[in-house]
């Protein structure tokens, strides 16, 4: 019924842009304390507790990458 081939190209929503945006929200460095609380008692939580500088740098890099990819995906839509 709503086959994507039948829809006009301007109505296609860039799903990759939304996925990259969601990853940017999850890996934002300001969410590091929330991640530490949520992951408490797990191996990932122990890693965050012991190596918080490495985790913050890694999350910041991933955040910048995913944010730039999300902005590029939404900019290509226009």
UniProtKB/Swiss-Prot annotation:
GO molecular function annotations of the record: mercury ion transmembrane transporter activity
UniProtKB keywords: Cell inner membrane, Cell membrane, Membrane, Mercuric resistance, Plasmid, Transmembrane, Transmembrane helix, Transport, Transposable element
Superkingdom, natural source: Bacteria
Keyword presence, Cell membrane: yes
Subcellular location(s) of the protein: Cell inner membrane
Membrane topology type: Multi-pass membrane protein
Main location class: membrane
Species the sequence originates in: Pseudomonas aeruginosa
GO cellular component: plasma membrane
General function of this protein: Broad mercury transporter that mediates the transport of both CH(3)Hg(I) and Hg(II) across the membrane.
Keyword ATP-binding assigned: no
Transmembrane segments: 19-39, 45-65
Protein name: Broad mercury transporter MerE
Record-linked InterPro entries: MerE
């Amino acid at each position: 019924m709503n086959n994507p081939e039948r829809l006009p190209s301007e109505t296609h929503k860039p799903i990759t842009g939304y996925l990259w945006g969601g990853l940017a929200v999850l890996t934002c460095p300001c969410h590091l304390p929330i991640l530490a609380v949520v992951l408490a008692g797990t191996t990932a939580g122990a890693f965050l507790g012991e190596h918080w500088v490495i985790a913050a740098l890694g999350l910041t890099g991933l955040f910048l990458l995913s944010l730039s990819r999300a902005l590029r995906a939404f900019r290509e839509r226009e």
